[in-house]
Each structure stands twice: as C-alpha cells, then as structure tokens.
C-alpha cells in the first residue's frame, strides 16, 4: 500500500525495497526535487519496524550519509542518524510534531507520514534553515550568504556521494532503478555539472553512465 502511494514524477520520486527475509526491515530511496541542491541524487534510508510499532515510531537511518560520513542536512547526520521529532530523535516544539500512537480519533502517526516528511521537509530548497533557530531574512545578507554557502557544500556532497558513488557502487536493491534514473537524466546531469564547472565529475559521470 505504501509503495503504491509514493510520489513518482519526472523530477522526483521515492522507491521502496522490502527485505524478503525479514518483514521488519526495508529501504526506501529518495530522488529529491530538481529545485533543491539535492537534484539528481539518490538517497537511501534503512528502516526497522520495532515489535511495538505503531505504538512507537520506526527506526530510520540514512545509509547514504553513514556510508560516506557526510552530513547532507541539519536533519541528516554523518553517522546516519535522522533527526526528526516524529521519530523521537529530536524534541519538537509541540506534541503534534511527535509520534502519535493509534487512537480512536484516527489521528495516529504512520510510516507513510515519516517517509513523506523526509521527502518534502528534509530535502528542501534551502536546507540550512532546517536547523532550529535559523530564520529566513531578506534583509540579513550574512544569513543569506551562509545559506547559499551551505547549499554549495550540499551540492558538492550530492554530486560526489549521491550521484557518482551511486553509479560506482549502487545501493543493493536499487541497482536497476539507479541505472535507469541516470540514463534518463543523462543530458540534464551533464548540463548541470557543466554549469557548476565540475569537469572531473563530468568526465567520471560520462565514463560510468
């Protein structure tokens, strides 16, 4: 049911891979929107469903961060930790942001909600502002400059680890999806790397594709 409800468009998508030996384990891969610094990247998450689910939240780990020791986002630690109040890994400002067990009102939290929160809220256009206490300000040039600089770092990490490395060492279970994704986006990725003057990465991409 979850896999059939996930977004699948020309610009972004989520793919689901169930562990055939253990129903409590699965992966999902996010291809973020192209208006974000994560464009064209393939980001994989490991999920464990605990015995007490849905009374307690699932355990989610960002495989792409963990394997490359790179922090893609204030919510995605280099160790793989996914920091979200919905997962109980961050203390949210209100009870509504936290995991809600099933109830008679039918307002309990769901696994689909977790996946979509990561897809839409974590992989945002300006991830620097995901850090609590950082607020957008048109008038504050220093803050805006820091956000732009952060985006450049995210772009570099995405190219190195979520594009090039995914072509070199595709995540198990998503090999075919990754291959098709980059084949379909070949010209767009090439143009993107050219615009960023990433000559070495462009040559590597052309060799791998």
Region locations from a protein language model:
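Short, solvent-exposed secondary-structure capping/transition elements
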Residues: 39, 54-58, 126-132
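N-terminal BTB/POZ boundary and linker segment
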Residues: 21-23, 28, 32-35, 45
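Proline-anchored loop/turn motifs at beta-strand termini and strand-loop-strand connectors
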Residues: 47-54
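Domain-scale recognition of soluble eukaryotic interaction modules
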Residues: 1, 62-209
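N-terminal leader/pro-regions and domain N-caps
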Residues: 1-26
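Short, solvent-exposed loop/turn segments at the edges of secondary structure
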Residues: 23, 40, 55, 77-79
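Residues in well-ordered beta-strands of folded domains
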Residues: 17, 29-31, 61-63, 85
């Amino acid at each position: 049911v979850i896999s059939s409800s996930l977004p699948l468009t020309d610009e972004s998508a989520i793919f689901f891979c169930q562990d055939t030996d253990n129903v409590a384990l699965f992966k999902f891969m996010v291809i973020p929107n192209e208006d974000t610094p994560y464009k064209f990247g393939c980001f994989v998450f490991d999920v464990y469903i605990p015995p007490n689910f849905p009374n307690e939240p699932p355990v989610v780990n960002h495989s792409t961060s963990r394997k490359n020791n790179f922090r893609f986002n204030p919510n995605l630690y280099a160790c793989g930790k996914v920091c979200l109040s919905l997962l109980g890994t961050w203390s949210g400002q209100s009870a509504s942001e936290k995991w809600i067990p099933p109830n008679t009102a039918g307002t309990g939290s769901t696994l689909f909600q977790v996946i979509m929160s990561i897809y839409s809220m974590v992989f945002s256009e300006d991830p620097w502002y995901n850090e609590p206490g950082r607020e957008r300000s048109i008038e504050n040039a220093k803050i805006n400059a820091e956000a732009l600089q952060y985006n450049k770092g995210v772009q570099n990490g995405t190219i190195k680890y979520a594009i090039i490395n995914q072509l070199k060492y595709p995540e198990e279970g998503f090999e075919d999806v990754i291959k098709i994704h980059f084949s379909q986006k070949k010209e767009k990725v090439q143009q993107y790397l050219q615009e960023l003057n990433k000559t070495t990465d462009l040559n590597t991409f052309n060799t791998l594709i």
